[in-house]
Structure formats: C-alpha cells, structure tokens
C-alpha cells in the first residue's frame, strides 16, 4: 500500500449480516437511472459493488465462483471511481485505486490457477484429444490450484480490510459537483485510449500491450453499462460487441497463462503435446480479437460519444 491513509477516510465500520443461505448472490445493479443525480447514483453503485465483493468473500471463501465474482465487483468499482475522477481529485482517486489494486492482485492468482484447469479441458475437448492421456498434467494443474486455495485463504482477511476501507470512504466522496459532461469526457477518454492502443497492437506482437488494451476494452464496457440508460437502445449493440471482444481476449489471456505454467513445469510427451497445441491457438485468437477491436474502435472519439444523451 503506497502513501499514508488520508485524514478524510470515513470511520464507520461495515458489518455484514450472517450468511444463512448458500444460494448464489444476486448480481448488483451497474447502471445509473434516468433522472438520478449522478454523484449520488455513482456512490450507490460503488456501495453495491463493494458490498457484493465482501459478501462473496465472507467466511474466507476462496471457492472459484465467489473469487471470480469478487474480482469482477472490484473491477466495476474501479470503473466507477475512474468515471467519477473529475470530482474525486487525484489524491483520493489514487488512494482508492491503490486499495482496489491491493485487493484484486491478491485474488488474481487464485482465479488464474483455477481457470488453467478449465482452459486445459476446453483445449483438449476442442482438439478431440482423450483426457486420460493428459491426466498427469491436469492433476498437476489441479494440485497447484488446491495449494493456492490453501495458502491464499489467509490473504482474505487482508483483502476484506482493503475493501472495507473503500466502503467506509464512499459516503465522503465529494461527487455533488459531477456533471453529465464530466462523464462524457471520461468515456470519450477511455475510448480514445483504447482506440490508440489497438492501432499499435495491430502493427506488432507486443503481448503486454495487448493485455493493456484488453483491460481498456473491459473498462469501456463497464462504463457503457454504467451509462446504458442514456444510450440509444440502452447501448445493447455496443455492449454486444465489446462483450464479445472481452470474452475472446479473456480466453487468449487464459491460454497465455496456461502456456506459461506448462512451460515452467515438468516435461513429458503429453505436456509437450499440450504446449504445442496451446501455442498454435494463441496467435489466431489474438488476431481475431484485434480485428474485432479495429472494427469496434473505427469511429473517431467524437463520433462514438455523440449518441450519449448526457
């Protein structure tokens, strides 16, 4: 955690109700209502997202589903903070983003280790290869995920503490001055950054730059959802495109992480075959995502933001 905790941090503790049901938690709202005051609405949405993340992790839960859902809620909260950035100010914004980064970065290895087992299953099924042939490789990945859960469950109290600090601060966010034009500018800025980055990605094979663009596209998707009620057709055409981009680029990322793990593990005939297979899948998948991205980001920023009724 960088820097000192600001003196304006809200001090009210968060007390979650006891978890009496194991039913899936309801997905919290992620859109501003028409006529709703922007500042008040964003604070309400941030509260819903943080409380959802805390509820998922309640009882030091490190099961795959809750970990994934908590990470998504953290990312959505980050998008809300960036959208509210003009009113929050740099110091407060960076403090909040740092807290979310600390929480999210501790959950990421848990999610990644679980997904690698699933990714291997998907790859083998798509290739029509017998799962039994790769049993030792799959068992090794499953053991990594199991050990990660055992080790990282101790991280959950720290993660919860970071999220509670964000939750405690929300009532103090000075968002009354936030205007519709501020949101337009922030979304336009996010779109412009993504547009510039995808142009560079299309002319080279920089893996990290592609990963950066993937996160920008996902961030734009959340901003579209936040303002969906102010777009024609509630932004459904745009959301459909950006969701497909996010899903395919996320798959590319999962395959890349799987490949890194297999390259660093023990080698045998089966693992070498799996490595070769995944290696051939990544470049065309990445190229497909880039082509979709270039099509989506074709309009200039001014033209893209024009239909937004804010």
Specify the residue positions occupied by each region the protein language model found.
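Cationic, histidine-enriched alpha-helical/coil surfaces that engage anionic ligands
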Residues: 8-310
């Amino acid at each position: 955690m960088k820097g000192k905790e600001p003196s304006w941090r809200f001090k009210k503790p968060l007390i979650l109700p006891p978890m009496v049901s194991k039913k899936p938690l309801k997905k919290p709202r992620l859109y501003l209502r028409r006529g709703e005051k922007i500042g008040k609405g964003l604070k309400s949405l941030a509260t819903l997202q943080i409380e959802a993340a805390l509820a998922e992790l309640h009882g030091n839960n490190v099961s795959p589903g809750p970990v994934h859902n908590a990470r998504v809620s953290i990312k959505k909260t980050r998008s809300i903070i960036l959208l509210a950035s003009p009113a929050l100010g740099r110091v407060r914004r960076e403090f909040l983003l740092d807290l979310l980064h600390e929480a999210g970065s501790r959950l990421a290895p848990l999610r990644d280790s679980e997904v690698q087992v699933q990714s291997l299953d998907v790859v083998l099924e798509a290739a029509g290869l017998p799962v039994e042939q790769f049993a030792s490789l799959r068992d090794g990945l499953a053991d990594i995920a199991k050990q990660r859960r055992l080790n990282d469950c101790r991280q959950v109290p720290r993660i919860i503490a970071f999220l509670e600090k964000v939750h405690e601060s929300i009532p103090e966010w000075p968002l009354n001055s936030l205007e519709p034009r501020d949101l337009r500018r922030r979304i336009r800025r996010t779109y412009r950054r993504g547009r510039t980055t995808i142009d560079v990605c299309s002319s080279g094979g920089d893996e990290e730059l592609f990963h950066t663009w993937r996160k920008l596209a996902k961030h734009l998707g959340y901003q579209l959802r936040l303002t969906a009620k102010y777009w024609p057709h509630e932004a459904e055409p745009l959301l459909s495109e950006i969701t497909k981009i996010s899903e395919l680029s996320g798959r590319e990322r999962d395959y890349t992480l799987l490949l890194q793990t297999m390259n660093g593990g023990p080698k045998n005939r089966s693992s070498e075959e799996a490595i070769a297979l995944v290696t051939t899948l990544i470049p065309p998948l990445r190229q497909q995502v880039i082509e979709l991205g270039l099509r989506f980001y074709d309009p200039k920023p001014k033209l893209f933001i024009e239909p937004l009724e804010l």
